[in-house]
């Protein structure tokens, strides 16, 4: 396997942890990703972080309720799964950052 990672990060307007967890768990599975583990943390007094460990890398969400938005980031070594996942989210992104990193 070639050392290659596709990375996409940006902001979405949803901040509800239950909605985010359910929506992105479903989309990751639909995209073909192998979800190995999921961890979450609730901050006091508000805020949430979710992290999905994937067989193909990882996906993370960090909510910023004070600003009414969440930061999401996907890193994947599987281009096909990555492209499908990103294509399903194009209407949700507030700003875009899209990178492909090749490691020596």
Spans of features found by a protein language model:
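Polybasic/polar functional segments that serve as interface/processing modules
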Residues: 1-104
């Amino acid at each position: 396997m070639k050392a290659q990672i596709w990375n996409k990060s940006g902001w979405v307007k949803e901040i509800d942890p239950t909605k985010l967890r359910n929506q992105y768990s479903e989309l990751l599975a639909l995209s073909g990703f192998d979800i190995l583990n999921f961890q979450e943390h609730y901050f006091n007094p508000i805020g949430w972080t979710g992290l999905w460990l994937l067989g193909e890398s990882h996906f993370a969400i960090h909510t910023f309720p004070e600003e009414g938005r969440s930061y999401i980031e996907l890193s994947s070594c599987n281009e096909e799964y990555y492209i499908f996942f990103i294509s399903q989210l194009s209407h949700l992104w507030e700003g875009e950052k899209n990178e492909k990193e090749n490691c020596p």
